[in-house]
Structure formats: C-alpha cells, structure tokens
C-alpha cells in the first residue's frame, strides 16, 4: 500500500471547470483521516493551493510552482528554489513585444502579468488569487519561483521552449504544463525531486508514493514515484516519454478519485 498520494490539480484532480467535485473531495478526506499522506503537487501558486487545502479541511503537504516551493502540513515554507536573478530578469521581457504571448511571474506571495488577460481567472474557482501588472524593467527579480508563458497557439511556444533551453541549459527546467502554457523553473526543480523531499520528511521513500498527472511538468514525479499514473487526456508527449506507466481515465470522469476509492476504500 502506498503511504503517500501525490496529485497534480489542473487536468488531473480538478474537473474540467477547475473545481473539486464532491466525488473528489470525499476520498481525500477519508484517506487523510486513515493516515495516508496526501500531497498537492502542482504548478499553481502556494497562496492559491493553500486556500484549496483549507477549504477541504485536510492536512497535507503542498508542492507548488512545479516543485520550487514546498509547504508543510501547517503551511510553513520548508523548501524554496528560485530562478537565478539574471535569468528571471531576462525572462520578464523576453516576449514582451509579442501580443500573442502573456508572461506570468510567481514571486514569493505575488503573481504578476505583463498585460491583462481576464480569462486567466477561470482557473480560480476554488480560491481567490489575483494578478498585478508589471513593467519588465521595473520588477525586482528576487524570490521568483517560476516564470510561465501562456498562448493560444502551442506552435508559437515551441520555439520559445527551444530558445530558453539553448540559452540557459541546465540552469533552467522548462516544461509544458498544458499545450498552451510553457513553464520555466530553476534547474533541478521538479515535482519529482520535491516529492522525494516530502516523502523523506514523512519517513518514507519514493517507492512508497503513488502519483497522478497529465502534463510534461509531471514527468519526473510520475517516473520517480513507486507508481505513476498518467491521465487519459494527458499530452501525447508525456505518454510517449513514459510508455511503461499506466494510463487511467480523464479528469472529466473523476478518474483519480475513482482510482483512490478502488485502491484504498473498497
């Protein structure tokens, strides 16, 4: 039996409308009441995820910003790995002139965007988290957990992914959380490495963990955990990268809570 359950949120545990269904909430409460450790493992910001956790009324670790931040059961920050200042500063303005690509910055407790995009707020059904606008040359690049780029066209983000990797190499970890969202963290940052740290803190190892995800930002976590489950609606790139992993149903079908009920509660 896996003692640690780690799950991504968007595209995985959350419904397509970015909410937690009642069917999803119940097993999380039952699992944690039985002593199984649930871990949120997401690209979302810790301020946002903390509200989701509090609304659920469960104790859980939070891996946020794709592993750049880890908070304990009481919400205390126990791990932080920021982008180097020079990289963060350059990323703030790298596509500022492209009207099709929005630049987002997570810095400590704040979220910044380089221009308004009201539709981003559709992700915040379970929490209240608002962005502020920034000017690239005026934003202090200290404490930046990640910079991410959103665009309706995946094809426009592909050359940006290649350019960032070519420029900074292993000083960054670049991955697509969705086809329309390219995320940049410091080198060595991943949900998988953060999960390893959390498991160790709990007295377990990665082999005691089961993980669920749908994005390329879940790749390390899914492959490093004792059991990794890929969502049926996941990027094909992720399925191709890890053909050895089990593919389950979709978030529209509440596949993760179904799986957890069968594994732990039946």
Swiss-Prot record:
Residue positions of the active site: 8 (nucleophile)
Catalytic reaction annotation: pyridoxal 5'-phosphate + H2O = pyridoxal + phosphate; sugar phosphate + H2O = sugar + phosphate
CDD domains: HAD_Pase
Disulfide bonds: none
Enzyme Commission identifier(s): 3.1.3.74, 3.1.3.23
Cofactor: Mg(2+); Mn(2+); Co(2+); Zn(2+)
UniProt KW Magnesium keyword: yes
Entry's cofactor comment: Magnesium. Can also use other divalent metal cations as manganese, cobalt or zinc.
Binding-site positions, Mg(2+): 8, 10, 214
Keywords, sorted A to Z: Hydrolase, Magnesium, Metal-binding
Keyword Hydrolase: yes
A Pfam family per the record: Hydrolase_3
Entry binding sites for phosphate: 9, 42-43, 191, 217
MF-aspect GO terms: magnesium ion binding; metal ion binding; pyridoxal phosphatase activity; sugar-phosphatase activity
InterPro entries registered for this protein in UniProt: Cof (IPR000150), HAD-like_sf (IPR036412), HAD-SF_hydro_IIB (IPR006379), HAD_sf (IPR023214)
Functional note: Catalyzes the dephosphorylation of pyridoxal-phosphate (PLP) and sugar phosphate.
Family: Belongs to the HAD-like hydrolase superfamily. Cof family.
Name assigned to this protein: Pyridoxal phosphate phosphatase YigL
Organism: Escherichia coli O157:H7
Taxonomic lineage of the native organism: Bacteria, Pseudomonadati, Pseudomonadota, Gammaproteobacteria, Enterobacterales
UniProt gene name: yigL
């Amino acid at each position: 039996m896996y003692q640690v359950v780690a799950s991504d949120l968007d595209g995985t545990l959350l419904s397509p409308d970015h909410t937690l269904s009642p069917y999803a909430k119940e097993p999380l409460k039952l699992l944690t009441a039985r002593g199984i450790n649930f871990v949120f493992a997401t690209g979302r910001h810790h301020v946002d995820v903390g509200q989701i956790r509090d609304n659920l009324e469960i104790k859980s670790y939070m891996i946020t910003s794709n592993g750049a931040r880890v908070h304990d059961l009481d919400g205390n920050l126990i791990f932080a790995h920021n982008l180097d200042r020079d990289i963060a500063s350059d990323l703030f303005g790298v596509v500022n002139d492209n009207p099709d690509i929005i630049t987002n910055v997570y810095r400590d407790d704040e979220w910044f965007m380089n221009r308004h995009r009201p539709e981003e707020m559709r992700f915040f059904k379970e929490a209240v988290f608002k962005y502020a606008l920034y000017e690239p040359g005026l934003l202090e690049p200290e404490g930046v957990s990640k910079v991410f780029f959103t665009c309706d066209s995946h094809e426009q983000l592909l050359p940006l992914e290649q350019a960032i990797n070519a420029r900074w190499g292993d000083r960054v970890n670049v991955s697509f959380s969705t086809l329309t969202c390219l995320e940049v963290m410091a080198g060595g940052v991943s949900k998988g490495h953060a999960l390893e740290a959390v498991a160790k803190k709990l007295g377990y190892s990665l082999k005691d963990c089961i993980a669920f995800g749908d994005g390329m930002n879940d790749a390390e976590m899914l492959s490093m955990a004792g059991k990794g489950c890929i969502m049926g609606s996941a990027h094909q790139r992720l399925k191709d990268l890890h053909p050895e992993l089990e593919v389950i149903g979709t978030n529209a079908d509440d596949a993760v809570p179904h799986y957890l009920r069968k594994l732990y509660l039946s």
